[in-house]
Regions:
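Short, basic alpha-helical/linker "hinge" immediately adjacent to a nucleic-acid-recognition surface
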Residues: 1-33
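Charged alpha-helix within mobile-element recombinases
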Residues: 21-34, 45, 170, 189, ...
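Mobile genetic element proteins and their domesticated derivatives, centered on retroelements
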Residues: 27, 41, 61, 123, ...
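DNA-recognition alpha helix
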Residues: 38-52
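Basic, flexible linker segments flanking DNA-binding modules
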Residues: 53-112
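An active-site-proximal beta-strand-loop segment
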Residues: 106-149
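Active-site beta-loop-alpha junctions of metal-dependent nucleic acid enzymes
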Residues: 130-133, 150-175
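Acidic/histidine-rich, metal-coordinating catalytic segments
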Residues: 175-194, 216-218
Length: 282
């Protein structure tokens, strides 16, 4: 427990942390308990209200971790490096177009360029690709702020997706939902096959609540924000996690963690810092 205290003393005055044990403890807590990357941990401290005597850069923090100065190790850090590509069979590569919805080619340029709020990407995180009847997470990522909404569904079917959006619309109200969810971009998975059900308002008869666009097959980069968000979710629910044993409360905690996580692409601000002021004005 006191190993890094001894390491601090052994390193001598050249260790910038010096005797600022409170700062060291705050960094350890963010990295080990809250699962932040070193850069995100430093940003969270800068964004916070509490001030410390010391301030270090990411490279210094990584060196401290590598040299055992702090009570955290490399295993506490997010995995880095490229993952091995799976050698997919021909059967896996063929993805049938399951909808007659609107192609991403017709999506407005302002959505592509992320110049305005209200445009989302949607995906699912699940336990088994083969079993569509197991509990699934519906993941929505706002393209401008990277704000995350995660909804636990009973299965990975188009009916459950429509029901989840209906519940979200009822909780917000029809007018606010239409402002917040102006467009939603999805892949060609069968859970997103009911584009009419997803677009149609549950509260206003014969009126649309959003516009759904479909990506090209095998182009996950067209939902890049979704893909990155899914990696953050997998820090908490690794592949193979039985989502039937994951509670709604646990899902909500992960959603909050993601939205409070400082991101490099946001200038080390959090999604909540960027999204909430806009959302509250709608």
């Amino acid at each position: 427990e006191h190993r890094y205290r001894a390491n601090l003393a052994a390193k001598g005055p050249q260790v910038k942390l010096g005797n600022d044990h409170e700062y060291a403890k705050a960094l350890e807590n963010l990295i080990v308990k809250k699962r932040y990357s070193p850069s995100a941990a430093l940003a969270a401290i800068r964004n916070g209200k509490k001030s410390f005597r010391t301030s270090i850069c990411p490279r210094t923090l990584y060196n401290y971790i590598a040299n055992g100065v702090l009570a955290c190790e490399k295993k506490d850090l997010p995995l880095k490096g490229k993952q091995k590509r799976r050698n997919r069979s021909r059967k896996e590569q063929i993805q049938k177009r399951v909808s007659c919805g609107t192609s991403i080619e017709y999506r407005p340029a302002e959505v592509d360029h992320r110049v305005s709020f209200g445009h989302w990407e949607m995906d699912t995180v699940y336990t088994s690709k083969k079993d569509r009847l197991k509990p699934t997470l519906l993941v929505l990522t706002e393209r401008c702020s990277r704000q995350e909404m995660i909804i636990r569904m009973r299965d990975r079917t188009s009916g459950s997706v429509v029901r989840a959006l209906n519940a979200l619309e009822r909780s917000m109200g029809a007018a606010k939902f239409s402002k917040v969810f102006q467009t939603i971009t999805v892949d060609n998975g069968s859970e997103f096959s009911d584009f009419e059900g997803m677009e149609k308002s549950a509260l206003r008869k014969r009126k649309a609540r959003t516009k759904v666009y479909y990506c090209h097959a095998h182009r996950s980069y067209e939902r890049g924000s979704n893909e990155n968000a899914n990696k953050l979710i997998r820090r908490h629910f690794p592949k193979g996690t039985d989502l039937s044993k994951v509670s709604v409360q646990q899902v909500a905690m992960v959603e909050t963690w993601i939205n409070d996580y400082p991101r490099r692409i946001l200038g080390w601000k959090t999604s909540n810092m960027i999204f909430r002021p806009w959302f509250d004005r709608q």
